[in-house]
Amino acid sequence: MREILHIQGGQCGNQIGSKFWEVVCDEHGIDPTGRYMGTSDVQLERVNVYYNEASCGRFVPRAVLMDLEPGTMDAVRTGPYGQIFRPDNFVFGQSGAGNNWAKGHYTEGAELIDSVLDVVRKEAENCDCLQGFQVCHSLGGGTGSGMGTLLISKIREEYPDRMMMTFSVFPSPKVSDTVVEPYNATLSVHQLVENADECMVLDNEALYDICFRTLKLTTPSFGDLNHLISATMSGVTCCLRFPGQLNSDLRKLAVNLIPFPRLHFFMVGFAPLTSRGSQQYRSLTVPELTQQMWDSKNMMCAADPRHGRYLTASAMFRGKMSTKEVDEQMINVQNKNSSYFVEWIPNNVKSSVCDIPPRGLSMSSTFVGNSTSIQEMFRRVSEQFTAMFRRKAFLHWYTGEGMDEMEFTEAESNMNDLVSEYQQYQDATADEEADYEEEEAAAE
């Protein structure tokens, strides 16, 4: 019941995804061969959200893994949980997308997409009542961004009423892997605005900062970064997988977080984040979690919530705690920082409580916020995009795959529209509406 189908694409998506499965397997007591080794019935109660139970009693992840080159797939397959996935669900090409969005979306990716969709259909038919899809990908490369958005639009056509949630890794401000990231990211956002329901925005730089500043890791690896992401991913869906006092699911999350359909890009955070050495000295309390969770240093994307205002936010707590205390803390946050919340959406923070904490912690919380300050990320990518596009730099790589310059112009203006929409609601006040109605009346 209420299954989620997980899809990972490209190198980044596959690396995040495989880390995520390690976390979820651990939470449900499933060992690398798919056997249940857990100790508590709670782990099995709703294990079918993410797993299919095979006839021999093994649990198989509802996961589809795709890439345009075999390398990362082989790494996943030989990794710690590589044997747990259904072998048919690995779909890969041989050519690679070479960091080129057009290859992922129009040429190489388009050739592979049908075999991916076959696997997706097969998995969806295995579901009792599919709730939605979660896609892990990055927006800077070629496969995750180009082919990822192609898959999202195809799934949107075929399953229009299912939730589509993405975990999207944006290009970072200072750390760049490839020079054409701004192109790939802008073309992807253009697609995500139209076809996704909720996007959790991540970026490597913010994750590096968390590892470096808070977790005191001197040389953070991608493994450390992906571990942070997977903790958040597990937190977002824990309410579906474990019993709780106040449940939430993908659709409830969307209804509570998205006041306007295009503004569905969220900042995420996780608490408690403690360095490995100091874990045992901490006593976790709800106020402490709440404070850390709302802290701007905890946000997993490089935008500062203090530069904008929250339209809405949602907090998912895990562990044994009193819901009354949770509610008090959330009201407390809103009262103390009222200037950071828009006043024309009253009670705009939703909380949910799930009884089962993650492994190794007595309680934890996951934060998802819809803040207007996320426009900083889009604005930054857009500036880099314009700088290159004005000179038509690197454009031949895209037009050579059959793309039109027009598509670039459209993507650019869509991104700029998104930025101005965020700005418009950041500046809006509650009494503007009244003025507007008076003007209307006067006009009539």
From Swiss-Prot:
<dbReference type="GO" id="GO:0046872">
    <property type="term" value="F:metal ion binding"/>
</dbReference>
<dbReference type="InterPro" id="IPR023123">
    <property type="entry name" value="Tubulin_C"/>
</dbReference>
<keyword id="KW-0342">GTP-binding</keyword>
<comment type="function">
    <text>Tubulin is the major constituent of microtubules, a cylinder consisting of laterally associated linear protofilaments composed of alpha- and beta-tubulin heterodimers. Microtubules grow by the addition of GTP-tubulin dimers to the microtubule end, where a stabilizing cap forms. Below the cap, tubulin dimers are in GDP-bound state, owing to GTPase activity of alpha-tubulin.</text>
</comment>
<dbReference type="GO" id="GO:0003924">
    <property type="term" value="F:GTPase activity"/>
</dbReference>
<feature type="binding site">
    <location>
        <position position="142"/>
    </location>
    <ligand>
        <name>GTP</name>
    </ligand>
</feature>
<feature type="binding site">
    <location>
        <position position="144"/>
    </location>
    <ligand>
        <name>GTP</name>
    </ligand>
</feature>
<feature type="binding site">
    <location>
        <position position="69"/>
    </location>
    <ligand>
        <name>GTP</name>
    </ligand>
</feature>
<dbReference type="InterPro" id="IPR008280">
    <property type="entry name" value="Tub_FtsZ_C"/>
</dbReference>
<dbReference type="GO" id="GO:0005737">
    <property type="term" value="C:cytoplasm"/>
</dbReference>
<dbReference type="InterPro" id="IPR017975">
    <property type="entry name" value="Tubulin_CS"/>
</dbReference>
<dbReference type="InterPro" id="IPR002453">
    <property type="entry name" value="Beta_tubulin"/>
</dbReference>
<dbReference type="Pfam" id="PF03953">
    <property type="entry name" value="Tubulin_C"/>
</dbReference>
<dbReference type="InterPro" id="IPR000217">
    <property type="entry name" value="Tubulin"/>
</dbReference>
<dbReference type="GO" id="GO:0005525">
    <property type="term" value="F:GTP binding"/>
</dbReference>
<comment type="similarity">
    <text>Belongs to the tubulin family.</text>
</comment>
<feature type="binding site">
    <location>
        <position position="11"/>
    </location>
    <ligand>
        <name>GTP</name>
    </ligand>
</feature>
<feature type="binding site">
    <location>
        <position position="138"/>
    </location>
    <ligand>
        <name>GTP</name>
    </ligand>
</feature>
<feature type="binding site">
    <location>
        <position position="204"/>
    </location>
    <ligand>
        <name>GTP</name>
    </ligand>
</feature>
<keyword id="KW-0479">Metal-binding</keyword>
<keyword id="KW-0206">Cytoskeleton</keyword>
<dbReference type="InterPro" id="IPR013838">
    <property type="entry name" value="Beta-tubulin_BS"/>
</dbReference>
<dbReference type="InterPro" id="IPR018316">
    <property type="entry name" value="Tubulin/FtsZ_2-layer-sand-dom"/>
</dbReference>
<protein>
    <recommendedName>
        <fullName>Tubulin beta-2 chain</fullName>
    </recommendedName>
</protein>
<keyword id="KW-0547">Nucleotide-binding</keyword>
<dbReference type="GO" id="GO:0005874">
    <property type="term" value="C:microtubule"/>
</dbReference>
<dbReference type="InterPro" id="IPR003008">
    <property type="entry name" value="Tubulin_FtsZ_GTPase"/>
</dbReference>
<comment type="subunit">
    <text>Dimer of alpha and beta chains. A typical microtubule is a hollow water-filled tube with an outer diameter of 25 nm and an inner diameter of 15 nM. Alpha-beta heterodimers associate head-to-tail to form protofilaments running lengthwise along the microtubule wall with the beta-tubulin subunit facing the microtubule plus end conferring a structural polarity. Microtubules usually have 13 protofilaments but different protofilament numbers can be found in some organisms and specialized cells.</text>
</comment>
<dbReference type="GO" id="GO:0000278">
    <property type="term" value="P:mitotic cell cycle"/>
</dbReference>
<dbReference type="InterPro" id="IPR036525">
    <property type="entry name" value="Tubulin/FtsZ_GTPase_sf"/>
</dbReference>
<dbReference type="InterPro" id="IPR037103">
    <property type="entry name" value="Tubulin/FtsZ-like_C"/>
</dbReference>
<feature type="binding site">
    <location>
        <position position="226"/>
    </location>
    <ligand>
        <name>GTP</name>
    </ligand>
</feature>
<dbReference type="Pfam" id="PF00091">
    <property type="entry name" value="Tubulin"/>
</dbReference>
<keyword id="KW-0460">Magnesium</keyword>
<dbReference type="GO" id="GO:0000226">
    <property type="term" value="P:microtubule cytoskeleton organization"/>
</dbReference>
<feature type="binding site">
    <location>
        <position position="143"/>
    </location>
    <ligand>
        <name>GTP</name>
    </ligand>
</feature>
<keyword id="KW-0963">Cytoplasm</keyword>
<keyword id="KW-0493">Microtubule</keyword>
<feature type="binding site">
    <location>
        <position position="69"/>
    </location>
    <ligand>
        <name>Mg(2+)</name>
    </ligand>
</feature>
<dbReference type="GO" id="GO:0005200">
    <property type="term" value="F:structural constituent of cytoskeleton"/>
</dbReference>
